[in-house]
From Swiss-Prot:
Function: Involved in mRNA degradation. Hydrolyzes single-stranded polyribonucleotides processively in the 3' to 5' direction.
Residue ranges of every copy of the RNB domain listed in the record: 189-516
Protein known as: Exoribonuclease 2
Catalytic activity: Exonucleolytic cleavage in the 3'- to 5'-direction to yield nucleoside 5'-phosphates
GO biological process, one term: mRNA catabolic process
Class of enzymatic activity (EC top level): hydrolase
InterPro entries in alphabetical order: CSD (IPR011129), NA-bd_OB-fold (IPR012340), RNase_B_OB_dom (IPR013223), RNase_II (IPR011804), RNase_II/R (IPR001900), RNase_II/R_CS (IPR022966), RNase_II/RNase_R (IPR004476), RNR_Ribonuclease (IPR050180)
Domain S1 motif: from-to ranges: 561-643
Documented EC number(s): 3.1.13.1
Gene3D superfamilies assigned: 2.40.50.640, Nucleic acid-binding proteins
Keywords in alphabetical order: Cytoplasm, Exonuclease, Hydrolase, Nuclease, RNA-binding
Annotated organism of origin: Yersinia pestis
Length: 644
């Protein structure tokens, strides 16, 4: 009777049209229910039965209903799924497979099956790559995924590395070597093999890409010659090797090992500036005055060099600091180290006055056993030899930036514009509230930014510095020259690590065109996008492996009385993020661990403080004592508690 009734259809259409709808992102909880967050402002409750249709992170459209004075969201349409490609652990039960995504808020197993091409017989605990293929909001009965790749079995000691690389779709192996020979016969190389070039690196470094030589001019100035390995002498543009390097973009440095951008035979052998081996290089010569100024006599050329010594950071630092456990092999090498130290001091002083110098932060190095277990974490402080190399490389990169800008007008530039113009007023307000007067428009200029940074660096704590970082832009990669506010420089283009950075290889080719007077093509914008994306993925991979190893390392300390000194690095509504200064691990302190009465404690990201009953008890950048309360291995989270 009601079938095909136009009035009923019209009524249904009206009801559908009149039902309020919102678009937002699903936020899951550990208790089965969830919330639909709309524009970060409003959230609507999603009951457990409705949560079975969606997944944490899904962007959906939902209808709104009222139940007992509470607005409830009922998922209706999928806009964008949270999961597409993901990694997880396989569960096998009665020949049926399911996979649990490796994500802290996704705990439900998803039915799955291997794609036809995958021949591996999956077992319980295996790690796999999967692709979502069914979703309840697409009309399917349940979630389902296809297993597209086997990563490793659950017993593999190197799970943190293999799973992380698979998650970010990064390579596990070095590229295969392709027959390569020197291919730049048209490039005239001067013979500098008689000069006393030295390399300074870590003891374990094999891919040495920079060597240094200094000549004392006798008038207080020095002629610095920076020789950089020349992989483009072997890697032809658009060749198979070049396309591989372009895709990888960087050597991927993970705890315990690296995955090179170029085949190891090139990176660690043919191109590496090994001692007493003749190598093709690009060379930059520049006079540095007694005050540390770079003169206008910058000159680039192609050359042959032969490193006379592979020096190690700690050895050189010890010798310069008067610890005689190590000695240079001869007086010529000793003289080079002494002259390099003088250049370092002059350049550092110049940059402190006219540019910006980063505050020294220690590096943390995992000492690993044969099975990937963390034996120890070594704190490596930056010493004088590290600063020597850093000052010489910064000088070389400034020279390249200026030369490319003058001769070509383009290159691969590192650009950082300081404060976000949309947020600079907020930055000025925070500064003013903390007793630092600042003109928003002046902060957007390089001199104004540098003046502020020098003032902040002179303050007794990092509180204000850490407060205003969120108003700054991120460094970018650009094909046109631009300032680098973070370094306090008007232009910066790296070319000193071509073995491990594809952007530096691009700049090598441009510098060669400049040297030979040939026509050069401006790099395509797609290259900068690829470089930025790969840099982001490599950093995430390094962080993820590090989190896994820290969780393994700190698990035995959970629940013990062992105390750690920690620095507060972030304050969120839910608690504090701290960095343990002894080993570099990041831990979370939930607000209830700070004060038992939740209503009396306020953790404010806006003010960078924690208040109890209106009294400030913690501020961002404070150093506090903590104990490890818990280590959650499944999410690699370290939970700490303040020592009372």
């Amino acid at each position: 009777m009601f079938q095909d009734n136009p009035l009923l259809a019209q009524l249904k259409q009206q009801l559908h049209t009149q039902t309020p709808r919102v678009e937002g992102v699903v936020k899951g909880t550990e208790k089965g229910f969830g919330f639909l967050e709309v524009d970060g402002q409003k959230s609507y409750f999603i009951p457990p039965p409705q949560m079975k249709k969606v997944m944490h992170g899904d962007r959906i459209i939902a209808t709104l209903h009222t139940d007992k004075d509470r607005e409830i969201a009922e998922p209706e349409t999928l806009v964008e799924p949270f999961l597409s490609r993901f990694v997880g652990r396989v569960q096998r039960k009665d020949d049926r497979l399911s996979i649990v995504p490796d994500h802290p808020l996704l705990r439900d197993a998803i039915q799955c099956r291997p794609v036809r091409e995958l021949t591996h017989s999956f077992q319980n605990g295996d790690w796999a790559v999967a692709e979502m293929c069914r979703h309840p909001l697409k009309g399917d009965r349940a979630f389902q995924a296809d297993l597209t790749a086997f990563i490793t079995n659950g017993e593999d000691h190197f799970v943190p590395w293999w799973v992380t690389l698979a998650r970010h779709n990064l390579e596990r192996e070095a590229p295969a070597m392709v027959e390569s020979a020197l291919n730049d016969a048209e490039l005239e190389r001067e013979d500098l093999t008689a000069l006393n070039f030295v390399t300074i690196d870590s003891a374990s470094t094999e891919d040495m890409d920079d060597a240094l030589f200094v000549q004392d001019n006798g008038d207080g100035s020095w002629l610095l010659t920076i020789a950089i390995a020349d992989p483009t002498a072997y890697v032809v543009e658009n060749s198979e090797l070049d396309l591989t390097a372009r895709k990888r973009a960087f050597t991927n440095y993970l705890p315990g090992f690296n995955i090179p951008m170029l085949p190891r035979d090139l990176s660690d052998n043919l191109c590496s500036l090994r001692p007493n081996e003749r190598r093709p290089v690009l060379v930059c010569r520049v006079t540095i005055t007694e005050e540390g100024t770079l003169s206008n006599d910058i000159r680039f050329s192609a050359a042959w060099v032969e490193s006379k010594a592979k020096l190690v950071y700690d050895d050189v630092s010890d010798w310069l600091e008067g610890n005689n456990r190590w000695q240079p092999q001869d007086t010529a090498i000793a003289e080079q180290i002494t002259l390099l130290k003088r250049i370092c001091d002059a350049r550092s002083n110049w940059r402190q006055q006219h540019a910006l110098v980063f505050k020294d932060r220690p590096d943390y190095r995992f000492l690993l056993g044969e099975k990937g277990e963390v034996l120890d974490i070594i704190v490596e402080h930056r010493r004088i030899a590290n600063r020597i190399v850093e000052e010489c490389m910064i000088a070389a990169n400034v020279c390249a930036a200026l030369a490319l800008r003058e001769h070509l007008g383009f290159g691969i530039y590192n650009v950082h514009t300081g404060f976000d113009p949309a947020l600079v007023e907020q930055a000025a307000s925070v500064l003013k509230a903390n007793g630092v007067g600042a003109d928003p428009q002046a902060l957007l200029t390089l001199p104004g930014f540098c003046e502020l940074r020098r003032h902040l660096d002179a303050l007794p704590t990092q509180f204000l510095d850490s407060r205003i970082r969120r108003f700054q832009t991120f460094a970018e990669i650009s094909t046109v020259p631009g300032p680098h506010f973070g370094l306090g420089l008007e232009a910066y283009a790296t070319w000193t690590s071509p073995i491990r950075k594809y952007g530096d290889m691009v700049n090598h080719r441009l510098l060669k065109a400049m040297i030979t007077g040939q026509q050069a093509e401006k790099p395509q914008e797609e290259i900068t996008v690829q470089l930025a994306e790969r840099r982001r993925l490599n950093r995430m991979a390094e962080r993820d492996v590090g989190d896994w190893l820290y969780a393994r390392y700190l698990q035995p300390q959970a629940g013990t009385d062992t105390r750690f000194t920690a620095e507060i690095i972030d304050i969120t509504r839910g608690g504090l993020r701290v960095r343990l200064l002894d080993n570099g691990a990041v831990a979370f302190i939930p607000a209830p661990f700070i004060h038992a009465v939740r209503d009396e404690v306020v953790c404010s990201q806006e003010t960078g403080t924690v208040q109890i009953k209106g009294e400030t008890v913690y501020s961002q950048s404070d150093k506090i004592e903590v104990r490890i309360a818990e280590v959650r291995m499944e999410t690699r989270n370290v939970i700490a508690r303040p020592v009372a």
